[in-house]
Amino acid sequence: MLLVIDVGNTNTVLGIYHEGELEYHWRIETSRHKTEDEFGMLLRSLFDYVGLMFDQIEGIIISSVVPPIMFSLERMCIKYFQIEPQIVGPGMKTGLNIKYDNPKEVGADRIVNAVAAIHLYGSPLIVVDFGTATTYCYINERKEYMGGAIAPGITISTEALYSRAAKLPRIEIARPDHIVGKSTVSAMQSGILYGYVGQVEGIVKRMKWQSKKNPKVIATGGLASLIADESDCIDIVDPFLTLKGLELIYERNRVESV
């Protein structure tokens, strides 16, 4: 079995693969201050819940956009699983040709998403990831990672509105009954949701225009389904795209090292 770990700024997603299939997955809050033992005990409780043992894990791969957490995570893998984890980063075989000015600047999550999307859906592609930041990645017809756009995530924007405007409440991100809100809450929901739909459609439209292609648009992340329901520009929602990419990269590097 393979343990895959995707560390984001807000949430960490863990998955267990067995014979190429995702059997279990969990989403937990990302904590920069947990020790290796706290991570170990957390995973112990998750494993116990589904009847797994640590010694069933044969490999571990981690992608992270939160460097401070990595020391504790790596130590946890060694102490509790007796496994040196693969870390997505420079020097790892991904099969992705990155055309960024400085390829080392591309976040591990964006690389992993691109690898999975190319493998599953072909190219050209636009991959939209609704996370703490909303990222847009363009992959051309030669399967080259050309770059993209990074915008504040929908949750960050909502929290900023709440914290900076004294009379505006904290709200649930949800589809309002009408685009013309009849209350403060519904008006905020309308502005936030449809403002983000407009952002997605605008950036995707401009990427397509600049590329002079008609790339398939793949969305992932916690709010992907909500946005996709309101827009025709998203072709496929794949909530486990990042975990799939981690499994692919692990297998490529495992085969390479054999």
Curated annotation (Swiss-Prot):
Protein's cellular compartments: Cytoplasm
Keywords attached to this entry: ATP-binding, Coenzyme A biosynthesis, Cytoplasm, Kinase, Metal-binding, Nucleotide-binding, Potassium, Transferase
One GO CC term on file: cytoplasm
Leading EC class: transferase
One example of a Gene Ontology biological process annotation: coenzyme A biosynthetic process
Record has Disulfide bond as a keyword: no
Signal peptide location: none
Binding positions for ATP per the UniProt entry: D6, V7, G8, N9, T10, N11, T12, V13, T132
Function: Catalyzes the phosphorylation of pantothenate (Pan), the first step in CoA biosynthesis.
Family note: Belongs to the type III pantothenate kinase family.
Protein's recorded name: Type III pantothenate kinase
Taxonomy of the source species: Bacteria, Bacillati, Bacillota, Bacilli, Bacillales
Name of encoding gene: coaX
